[in-house]
Amino acid sequence: MAHRSSGSAVARAQAGDEEAFRTLWRDLNPRLVRYLRVLAGDDAEDLAAQTWEAVIGGLDRFQGDDDGFAGWVFTIARHRHLDGRRRAARRPHELGGDYRLELLAAGDDPGAEAVNRIGTEDALRLIGMLAPDQAEVVALRTLGGLEVAEVAAIVGKRPGTVRVLSHRGLRRLAEALEATRLFDSEV
């Protein structure tokens, strides 16, 4: 059976093809949940479900190809997360929970290798040390697998700014890993 592209899957899903929508979900949801784990921790699955509900509700209005679809879904997820943070800021809450981070393979991105060489708990700790804008950009690039232009559209920054944030964030992660490696070799 020939594999159909996500672009054609988007058009078929918009026409009501449930199997096409399932294909889109299977292809994109794991990356979406990984990104949301960085932003929302234990609430990532719930936030992903809310995102997909919004996607279903707005699918008929989406215009674009498969790459645009992924960016659109991540934008919806980010907006859902920010809306939740705004609501939470209006009421007292307690932070906590055991946050897990599942990492995607870095592919050809050498900077992302730093993120992938470490375990879940260490990755979360190190990404948590980054400035919030660096952490989000690093998460979208390495965990979401998105291109610079897509990340720029999602976070509302210029592509050059996204490149700088990504580079600085990944450099800080690599430096932290190197410091850890030196410390471990001295012990």
Predicted regions: what is each one?
Residues A15-E18, A106-L140, G144-I154, E175:
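Amphipathic alpha-helical segment used for protein-protein interaction
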Residues A2-S6, R91-T120:
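Internal acidic/polar
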Residues V38, G57-G64, T75-G96, N116, ...:
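Arg/Lys-rich amphipathic alpha helix in sigma70-family domain 2
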Residues W25, A48, V55, R141-G144, ...:
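Core residues of bacterial helix-turn-helix
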Residues Q14-R22, V33-Q50:
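Short, charged helix-capping/linker segments at alpha-helix termini
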Residues R78, L82, Q134, L143, ...:
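DNA-recognition helix of helix-turn-helix
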Residues L24-D42, G58, I127, A179:
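Amphipathic, Lys/Arg- and hydrophobic-enriched alpha-helical face
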Residues D46-E53, D67-H79:
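Structural recognition of an alpha-helix C-terminal capping motif at a helix-to-coil junction
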